[in-house]
Amino acid sequence: NIGFDNFTTDYVIPVEVPHRAKDFDTYGLLFKGQSKNLFFLPDHDSWEETLRFVAEDNPLNWFKSLEADIVLLDGTFWDEKELKDRPQNKVSHPTVKNTLELVEKRDYGHPRIVFVHFNHTNPLHYPDSSEFKKVIDMGWEIGEEGMEFSI
């Protein structure tokens, strides 16, 4: 376990987020660059719980409050039907489908959102899938190994 009590830096800022285990803390990381900021959030609870925890009403408003230009975002599951043998409420992650409903189509001034951290069952692994196409058509991105970000 890594504790962030009294951890300070001007360039990497831990941002606490709720997650299913109550025995330890979960954090996203905000990297402050010379020209842009990148928020890495590969794991958190439902949007309802996370937004309540950070006192925001929408993911985009939260990202704006963090001054995030690029967001690497939890894309573990496409939807709640993805796991055949386990109910989705037992595996706390917001679905990409739910995230898209909240952020809608990318508009001027919105951060660059890149979905990452995919479960092996997620159809976003396949560029020819309708789900992959939907994310791209809405102006968002699918992370791929080796991507680099300049901040």
Region annotations inferred by a language model:
Residues 37, 45-146:
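Cap/insert and terminal regions of metallo-dependent hydrolase folds
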Residues 1-58, 64, 146-151:
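Core dinuclear metal-dependent hydrolase active-site scaffold
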